């Protein structure tokens, strides 16, 4: 079954590469022991700032794709089956879900919100002449804690994905087996137009 189009797969890859670059450079800028190893702080700052801004580009460019827009709608809607999935998951019982389960929907919402907050606070920190010191101080606080939250979310995302080779294959090739789809996304497998 087709799970993702070529455009959707490239949006994911582009966003992952740019956010990964942003997070790695952030670690080298923030952690003293890594800062000492890297040196060239000015270069790291420049790469960090531009990769952070560029991380928005794949998603914005992806809005041209009808399939991507349809998946954004799916990610933005919680239905009765989603509430059932959450209750069943807390009790460690199986429950059908659509193309995206509620865990994926919550991750997408939190990650998107965190990226927007990180971009806004980063811009305040970057263009210091545009904001008073109190705003820059608050932006730094929010940016640092937001980075920690986003890092934890991304590591959790990678951890869960590492335990599902067929899901990773679906993101690499665009296709998953019908058996996998029925096991993990039954409502979508039975009605791909969900």
Regions found by a protein language model. Name each.
Residues 1-194:
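Membrane-embedded alpha-helical bundles that constitute the cytochrome b-like, heme-associated redox core
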């Amino acid at each position: 079954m087709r799970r993702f189009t070529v455009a959707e797969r490239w949006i994911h890859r582009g966003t992952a590469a740019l956010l990964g670059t942003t997070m790695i450079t952030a670690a080298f800028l923030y952690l003293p022991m890594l800062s000492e190893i890297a040196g060239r702080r000015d270069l790291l700052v420049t790469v960090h700032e531009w990769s952070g801004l560029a991380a928005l580009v794949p998603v914005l460019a992806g809005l041209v794709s009808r399939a991507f827009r349809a998946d954004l709608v799916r990610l933005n809607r919680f239905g009765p089956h989603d509430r059932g999935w959450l209750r069943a998951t807390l009790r460690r019982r199986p429950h059908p879900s659509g193309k995206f389960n509620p865990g994926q929907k919550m991750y997408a919402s939190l990650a998107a919100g965190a990226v927007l907050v990180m971009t806004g606070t980063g811009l305040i920190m970057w263009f210091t002449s545009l904001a008073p010191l109190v705003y820059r101080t608050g932006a730094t606080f929010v940016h640092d804690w937001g980075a920690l939250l986003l890092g934890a979310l991304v590591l959790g995302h990678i951890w869960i994905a590492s335990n599902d080779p067929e899901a990773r294959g679906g993101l690499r090739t665009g296709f998953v087996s019908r058996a996998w789809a029925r096991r993990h996304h039954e409502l979508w497998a039975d009605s791909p137009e969900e």
